């Protein structure tokens, strides 16, 4: 069964147009489903739809766009027609936005004949702009004066204030033919329309009195008002009777005259924008510097429109006043990742500071960025000049933001500095904000002063900051080092401390330390603070407590330093060398076969030999107390080298090693 086989009783009245919108529309408006169910019997139906009362004229008169694609989720509650009708198709979006459609099989409508006229555009301004779904009809003649548009806006507000229906508002406007409705371009006088909405109540009373005057007197008053406004056409705020808005808008600097190029500039946080407003500078990424320099050299004005990330707002615009490359102090920028990666500073002049929402710029698309909305832009994305000018004009429609107070204070400070005769270079550097380089220099100076403040700390040897000082303990025979203890590399003395630039010890276990990873460089580095308990240092007497409550005397004997074999040598102590040690001597000749055989008999391998010599140092040191000075010197030289016990045939023999093996069993 086709739709043509269906017939309803009320279809006969659809073909008959209503006479002047009289009593005919009542039964049709009471049954909204009948219009949609009638299929194509009624034709376009827009002619009779306008006469149907109380806002039901456009109900299901246009085919639903979403239903055509199978995406409408409203079902029966949808106010559009869920039926394919060629005569009731909506206007093609390409034809509406670009004026043409290149699709030959496009099923949408390509004319504005059946589209309603926009009531907001009739009053002089439509906030939807070219994206409005209603028809914008330009009326002949000059645009109406600002006062007339203001009167209409105040009248609409007064009606809404007393909860009157909006359609009554439109009907009363249609009954007053003495006011010429309509306007030229939708952006004409847009600045005045938005700023004058905050007028005082006296203006509303004046508007009501002028409606009661005859048309001739109204025309004379309009001519006088136009003559008064002619010398103030350049000033956008003179027509506003509110003094507060006049004072707030006077701070903003108008856009410069002449050719301009516009760029979107992104800021990762608000702190950088406050620094820029305070100091009049900015810094972008190094990859964008060449683009801005080329624009600065090729055109008179380079306008930067700023936007902070994740705010969905534009915060204002500024003019680029210097080329990137020269030295300009200030900055201390903060990046999103915590480390500054910006380029060099350049000076700017702030023109306007406000908060413009992205929702008010959805109709502006950038041809330089694949015709995407201006809100979708990267850092230093250039705008098409016409689009950039429109976006900058929208910034001036918004009230000044709180950053304007910072800008006023910064400008006042600059004026004071000029009056005092401060040079431009000194004025560019803000004393309240310190650069990163200055902080590093201050830290270096403080560290040098602390090192020079101690008397004997300037004496010492070695390079760098020294090394870590873990706790030392006498090693037993054949055992490995304690966790955190340092080993004995070659050419090192018995305590594992190097005479040269220091031998840094790896610390894979993260043991507790008494000092930072680098130990003291000079003997007096511990004058300002004592080490942790249990820390023992070469060349210093052990302190009781900490690791050993009774001190190291119970292990090493009274008056003896830790791990120091042999007899003490006379002479003053030297930095980084234990007290009682002999001067550094060249190593002895290579070992013989006897030492090699003994190394093979060691159960602990090479690692056990390294630490076994340490235990031998302590045992032989106690045994050598009653020997002569020559034997003590030989044992001392044997203690200073890790493998000297295996190389000296006179100091140790096989007979001496035999009892030790027996004791080991």
Curated annotation (Swiss-Prot):
<dbReference type="GO" id="GO:0005654">
    <property type="term" value="C:nucleoplasm"/>
</dbReference>
<dbReference type="InterPro" id="IPR036855">
    <property type="entry name" value="Znf_CCCH_sf"/>
</dbReference>
<feature type="compositionally biased region" description="Acidic residues">
    <location>
        <begin position="439"/>
        <end position="454"/>
    </location>
</feature>
<feature type="compositionally biased region" description="Low complexity">
    <location>
        <begin position="205"/>
        <end position="238"/>
    </location>
</feature>
<feature type="region of interest" description="Disordered">
    <location>
        <begin position="1"/>
        <end position="55"/>
    </location>
</feature>
<dbReference type="InterPro" id="IPR045168">
    <property type="entry name" value="YTH_prot"/>
</dbReference>
<dbReference type="GO" id="GO:0000398">
    <property type="term" value="P:mRNA splicing, via spliceosome"/>
</dbReference>
<protein>
    <recommendedName>
        <fullName>Zinc finger CCCH domain-containing protein 45</fullName>
    </recommendedName>
</protein>
<dbReference type="InterPro" id="IPR007275">
    <property type="entry name" value="YTH_domain"/>
</dbReference>
<feature type="zinc finger region" description="C3H1-type 3">
    <location>
        <begin position="114"/>
        <end position="139"/>
    </location>
</feature>
<feature type="compositionally biased region" description="Basic and acidic residues">
    <location>
        <begin position="596"/>
        <end position="623"/>
    </location>
</feature>
<dbReference type="InterPro" id="IPR000571">
    <property type="entry name" value="Znf_CCCH"/>
</dbReference>
<feature type="compositionally biased region" description="Polar residues">
    <location>
        <begin position="239"/>
        <end position="250"/>
    </location>
</feature>
<feature type="region of interest" description="Disordered">
    <location>
        <begin position="561"/>
        <end position="665"/>
    </location>
</feature>
<dbReference type="GO" id="GO:0003677">
    <property type="term" value="F:DNA binding"/>
</dbReference>
<feature type="compositionally biased region" description="Gly residues">
    <location>
        <begin position="561"/>
        <end position="573"/>
    </location>
</feature>
<feature type="domain" description="YTH">
    <location>
        <begin position="260"/>
        <end position="395"/>
    </location>
</feature>
<feature type="region of interest" description="Disordered">
    <location>
        <begin position="167"/>
        <end position="256"/>
    </location>
</feature>
<feature type="coiled-coil region">
    <location>
        <begin position="432"/>
        <end position="459"/>
    </location>
</feature>
<dbReference type="Pfam" id="PF04146">
    <property type="entry name" value="YTH"/>
</dbReference>
<keyword id="KW-0677">Repeat</keyword>
<dbReference type="GO" id="GO:0003729">
    <property type="term" value="F:mRNA binding"/>
</dbReference>
<keyword id="KW-0479">Metal-binding</keyword>
<keyword id="KW-0862">Zinc</keyword>
<dbReference type="GO" id="GO:0048024">
    <property type="term" value="P:regulation of mRNA splicing, via spliceosome"/>
</dbReference>
<dbReference type="GO" id="GO:1990247">
    <property type="term" value="F:N6-methyladenosine-containing RNA reader activity"/>
</dbReference>
<keyword id="KW-0238">DNA-binding</keyword>
<feature type="zinc finger region" description="C3H1-type 2">
    <location>
        <begin position="86"/>
        <end position="113"/>
    </location>
</feature>
<feature type="zinc finger region" description="C3H1-type 1">
    <location>
        <begin position="58"/>
        <end position="85"/>
    </location>
</feature>
<feature type="region of interest" description="Disordered">
    <location>
        <begin position="439"/>
        <end position="469"/>
    </location>
</feature>
<keyword id="KW-0175">Coiled coil</keyword>
<feature type="compositionally biased region" description="Gly residues">
    <location>
        <begin position="33"/>
        <end position="50"/>
    </location>
</feature>
<feature type="compositionally biased region" description="Polar residues">
    <location>
        <begin position="169"/>
        <end position="200"/>
    </location>
</feature>
<keyword id="KW-0863">Zinc-finger</keyword>
<dbReference type="GO" id="GO:0008270">
    <property type="term" value="F:zinc ion binding"/>
</dbReference>
């Amino acid at each position: 069964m086709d739709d043509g086989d269906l017939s309803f009783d009320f279809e006969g009245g659809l073909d008959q147009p209503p006479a002047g919108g009289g009593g005919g529309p009542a039964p049709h408006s009471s049954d909204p489903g009948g219009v949609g169910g009638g299929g194509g019997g009624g034709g376009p139906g827009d002619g009779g739809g306008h006469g149907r009362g109380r806002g039901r004229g456009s109900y299901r008169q246009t085919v639903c766009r979403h239903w055509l694609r199978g995406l409408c989720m409203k079902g029966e509650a949808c106010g559009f027609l869920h039926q394919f009708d060629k005569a009731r198709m909506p206007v093609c979006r390409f034809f509406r936005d670009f004026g043409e459609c290149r699709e030959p099989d496009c099923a949408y409508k390509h004319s504005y004949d059946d589209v309603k006229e926009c009531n907001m555009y009739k009053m002089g301004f439509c906030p939807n702009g070219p994206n409005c779904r209603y028809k914008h009809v330009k009326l002949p003649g000059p645009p109406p004066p600002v006062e007339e548009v203001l009167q209409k806006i105040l009248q609409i507000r007064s009606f809404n204030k007393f909860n009157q229906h909006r359609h009554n508002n439109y009907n009363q406007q249609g009954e007053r033919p003495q006011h010429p409705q309509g306007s030229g371009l939708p952006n004409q006088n847009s600045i005045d329309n938005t700023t004058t909405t905050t007028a005082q109540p006296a203006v509303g009373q004046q508007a009501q009195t002028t409606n009661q005057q005859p048309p001739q007197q109204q025309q004379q008053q309009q001519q006088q008002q136009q003559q008064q406004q002619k010398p103030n056409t350049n000033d956008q705020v003179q027509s506003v009777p509110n003094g507060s808005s006049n004072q707030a808008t006077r701070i903003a600097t108008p856009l410069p005259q002449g050719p301009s190029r516009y760029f979107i500039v992104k800021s990762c946080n608000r702190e950088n924008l406050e620094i820029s407003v305070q100091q009049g500078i900015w810094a972008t990424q190094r990859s964008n510097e060449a683009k801005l320099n080329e624009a600065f050299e090729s055109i008179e004005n380079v306008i930067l429109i700023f936007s902070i990330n994740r705010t969905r707002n534009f915060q204002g615009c500024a003019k680029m006043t210097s080329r990137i490359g020269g030295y300009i102090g200030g900055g201390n920028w903060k990046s999103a990742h915590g480390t500054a990666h910006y380029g060099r500073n350049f000076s700017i002049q702030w023109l306007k500071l406000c908060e413009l929402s992205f929702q008010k710029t959805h109709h502006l698309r950038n041809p330089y960025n694949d015709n995407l909305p201006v809100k979708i832009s990267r850092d230093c994305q250039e705008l098409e000049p016409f689009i950039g000018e429109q976006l900058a004009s929208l910034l001036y429609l918004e009230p000044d933001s709180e950053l304007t107070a910072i800008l006023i204070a910064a400008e006042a400070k600059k004026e004071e500095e000029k009056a005092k005769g401060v040079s431009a270079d000194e004025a560019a550097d803000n004393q309240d904000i310190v650069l990163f380089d200055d902080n590093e220099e201050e830290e270096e100076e403080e560290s040098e002063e602390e090192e020079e403040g101690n008397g004997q700390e300037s004496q010492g040897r070695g390079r760098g900051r020294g090394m870590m000082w873990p706790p030392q303990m006498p090693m037993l025979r054949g055992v490995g080092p304690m966790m955190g203890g340092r080993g004995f590399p070659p050419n090192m003395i018995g305590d594992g401390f190097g005479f040269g630039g220091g031998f840094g010890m790896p610390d894979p276990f993260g043991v507790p330390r008494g000092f930072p990873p680098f130990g003291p460089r000079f003997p007096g580095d511990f004058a300002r603070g004592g080490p942790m308990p249990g820390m023992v240092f070469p060349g210093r007497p052990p302190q009781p407590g900490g690791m050993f409550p009774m001190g190291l005397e119970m292990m090493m004997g009274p008056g003896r330093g830790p791990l120091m074999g042999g007899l003490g040598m006379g002479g003053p102590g030297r930095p980084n060398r234990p007290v009682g040690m002999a001067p550094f001597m060249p190593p002895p000749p290579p070992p013989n076969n006897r030492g090699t055989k003994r190394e093979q008999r060691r159960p602990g391998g090479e690692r056990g030999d390294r630490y076994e010599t340490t235990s031998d140092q302590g045992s032989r040191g106690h045994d050598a107390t009653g020997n002569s000075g020559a034997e003590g010197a030989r044992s001392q030289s044997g203690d200073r080298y890790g493998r000297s016990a295996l190389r000296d045939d006179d100091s140790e023999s096989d007979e001496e090693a035999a009892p030790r093996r027996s004791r080991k069993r």
